[in-house]
Amino acid sequence: MSFLWAKEFCVLKYPYKLFITHKFSYLLRFETVTLNNIRSPQFYAKLTFSHHQPTVSGTMSTELKFISKYLQISIPETKEGPVSSLFKAVSEQKPELLGNTDFEKAQILEWTTKAFSPIETQSIVEQLDEFLKSSTFIAQDSGISVADLAVYARIHSYICGLSAKEGYKLNNVCRWFDFIQHQESVMEAANSMSMKLANIDLNAPKIQRPSVIKKDKKEKKEGKPSQEASVKSVEKAPKGLEGAKKEKQNKKEKKDKKDKKDKKEKAPKEPPKAATPVPSMIDFRIGFIEKAVKHPNADSLYVSTIHCGDAEGPRTVCSGLVKYIPLEQMQQRKVIVVANLKPVNMRSVKSQAMVFCASSPDKSVVEFVLPPENAEIGDRLTFEGFDTEEPEAQLNPKRKIWEAIQPGFTSGEDLICGYKDESGLHRLFVKGKKDLGFCKAQTVVNGTLS
């Protein structure tokens, strides 16, 4: 494989594949090597940088020192450059941090190089925010890589200095950074270097509205008389016989107008009543779990990356299933998600949906509600008798819609899941694709769904 780095873009080229990566503002020089040798210590010993590589030791030593603390190994800076030294040491001690596939290796090399480059930190953060729209980690699906560690150390002080408003605009980076900084091994390494935790709030900042000053009614009364009052006072002061006749006539005309107005006026309309909660208000969708890991701060929670058909990419979802479902069963599978609950922070990780499960009456068994086999990712689900209505964009917690409807969700004797009311069970199916079949529990009969 040959790495050809140009001033405008980087091309990673090898037989039958071509990748064009992010823009670079500096030049690098690499030896020609094969993909089979990309992990070998000999490759990293040969990896060299041109004179365009930065020589400011303060920035570089921070990344190297942090990763040394994380791996609990010594990484000396050599004449070949920091990335060469780093990759050589990691390949000997923790090769799994350098990627499994060819593409992962290339991504890790690219982002690690950026972390040690003279590119402005703000530019790296903006590129990373775009890159992380559809990823939990920088390169490896399975977890942290050396690129995550290097970039974390590079942008740490920048993220710590962001305001809440600035952080919300970079929500992909901040979500990733918050997840990385709460990993136990990362926290230990950071504490040893006095790197503080960044205070990250992924909620939208409140809009400051100017306060409205109400005028005092007394001031209004004590002010000058209005023009209308002046006219009335003039009308109440008729002069002579002619003035008295005019006053009488005016009073009669006003009375007639008032009578007509009273007849035209209708009874005031009653304010519209709040809609009764119905199951169609909830946005059930087919989701696909790309990967799941254990929550860094909660032993009972998984953190999953789930594709729900959103244009913005996958969602991060926390679920309390550690006690009931093994981690290996949380990977690469279709599930049903509730997609319009208000996002909530669960031990510093924002959860953007909920996995829909069936539980036995005694809560000893909790299992996924299974979607129809041929349902597609992002398909909406609906209930019989409610399939003509659209779900709410987001459920208002104050209206308690979920709390009102959820007790009616159940699995029947035949394991088919639905919403049960006085008229019977309304079965759950893919909207517009009822022929695919109904959603079912795996083993739980007459269970609760939530």
From Swiss-Prot:
Region named Disordered: 208-278
Swiss-Prot/TrEMBL keywords: Cytoplasm, RNA-binding, tRNA-binding
Pfam family for this entry, one: Arc1p_N_like
SUPFAM superfamilies to which the protein is assigned, alphabetical: GST C-terminal domain-like (SSF47616), Nucleic acid-binding proteins (SSF50249)
GO biological process terms, semicolon-separated: formation of translation preinitiation complex; tRNA aminoacylation for protein translation
Residue ranges with Basic and acidic residues bias: 213-225, 233-247, 262-272
Subcellular localization: Cytoplasm
Biased composition (Basic residues): 248-261
Organism, scientific name: Schizosaccharomyces pombe (strain 972 / ATCC 24843)
Residues in tRNA-binding domain copies: 278-382
The name this protein goes by in its record: tRNA-aminoacylation cofactor arc1
CDD domains from the UniProt entry: GST_C_AaRS_like, tRNA_bind_EMAP-II_like
Subunit record text: Component of a yeast aminoacyl-tRNA synthase (aaRS) complex formed by methionyl-tRNA synthase, glutamyl-tRNA synthase and the tRNA aminoacylation cofactor arc1 in a stoichiometric complex. Interacts with rar1/mes1 and gus1.
Role summary: Binds to tRNA and functions as a cofactor for the methionyl-tRNA synthetase (MetRS) and glutamyl-tRNA synthetase (GluRS). Forms a complex with MetRS and GluRS and increases their affinity for cognate tRNAs due to the presence of a tRNA binding domain in its middle and C-terminal part.
Record flagged with keyword Cytoplasm: yes
InterPro entries per record: Arc1-like_N, Glutathione-S-Trfase_C_sf, NA-bd_OB-fold, tRNA-bd_dom, Tyrosine-tRNA_ligase_regulator
Molecular-function GO term, any one: tRNA binding
